[in-house]
C-alpha cells in the first residue's frame, strides 16, 4: 500500500495522531488554520519510505489486496480508525510505503469526537496482543520511549477534553509505561479534569 503521510511505528499504546516526530514519514501539503503547510520527512534519499501506518487521506492498494483485507465497516463505524486497522492488517502480511516523488494534499485537520475514542478502544481490543509493530530498528529503550509518549498524549487529551467515559481505559494504558516526569506533566490536566467534573455535578445538581 502507498500513501503520502504515515508512521514507521504503531505503538501498543493508543495513539490519536501517531507519535514521536522521528517516526513520521510524509510528503504532504496540509491545510491547517487557514494556511497550507508543507510536511516532508523521509528515511534516507529513497523515493519510498517503509511504514506501518498510512493516513487514510490517501490509500493506494492493489485490488487483490483490498479484496483480501477490506475495511471493517461493521466494527469501525463513523469513519475513525478504519484506516489504522486496515494498515495493520496489510503490514502483517505485505508492506506499506510513503511516496516521496509526489506530494499529496490534505484539506482536513481531522476531528476528535466521541466516535473516535470509541473506535480507539475497539482497535486496542483487536490488536493489543500484536503491537507494537515497527519497520525501523529500535532498542528496548526506544520502544519504551515511544510507548510512554503515545500513552501520555492519549491520556492527556482524554483528561483535558473531559472524556470521562474513556478515562479508566486511558489510565490503564498509561500505567503500563508511566514515568515520574510524565506524571508531573499530567498533573495540570488531571486538575483540569477534576474541575470539569465539579462543574458537571454543579450543573446537574
What residues fall within each predicted segment?
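Non-catalytic, C-terminal membrane-associated alpha-helical segments of glycosyltransferases
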Residues: 142-205
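Active-site donor/metal-binding and catalytic loop motifs
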Residues: 97-142
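Residue-level marker of regulatory loop/turn positions in helix-turn-helix DNA-binding domains and
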Residues: 58, 79, 147
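A contiguous catalytic/ligand-binding core that recognizes phosphate-bearing ligands
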Residues: 20-45
Amino acid at each position: 500500500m502507498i500513501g503520502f503521510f504515515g508512521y514507521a511505528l504503531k505503538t501498543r499504546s493508543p495513539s490519536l495522531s501517531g507519535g514521536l516526530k522521528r517516526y513520521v514519514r510524509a510528503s504532504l501539503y496540509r491545510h491547517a488554520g487557514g494556511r497550507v503547510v508543507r510536511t516532508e520527512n523521509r528515511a534516507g534519499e529513497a523515493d519510498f519510505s517503509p511504514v506501518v501506518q498510512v493516513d487514510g487521506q490517501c490509500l493506494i492498494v492493489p485490488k487483490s489486496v483490498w479484496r483480501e483485507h477490506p475495511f471493517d465497516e461493521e466494527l469501525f463505524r463513523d469513519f475513525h480508525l478504519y484506516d489504522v486497522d486496515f494498515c495493520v492488517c496489510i503490514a502483517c502480511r505485505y508492506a506499506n510505503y510513503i511516496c516521496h516523488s509526489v506530494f499529496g494534499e490534505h484539506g482536513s485537520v481531522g476531528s476528535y469526537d466521541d466516535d473516535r475514542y470509541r473506535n480507539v478502544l475497539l482497535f486496542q481490543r483487536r490488536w493489543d496482543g500484536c503491537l507494537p509493530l515497527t519497520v525501523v530498528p529500535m532498542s528496548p529503550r526506544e520502544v519504551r520511549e515511544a510507548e510512554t509518549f503515545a500513552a501520555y498524549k492519549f491520556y492527556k487529551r482524554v483528561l483535558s477534553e473531559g472524556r470521562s467515559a474513556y478515562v479508566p481505559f486511558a489510565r490503564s494504558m498509561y500505567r503500563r509505561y508511566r514515568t515520574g516526569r510524565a506524571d508531573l506533566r499530567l498533573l495540570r490536566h488531571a486538575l483540569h479534569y477534576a474541575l470539569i467534573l465539579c462543574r458537571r455535578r454543579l450543573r446537574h445538581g
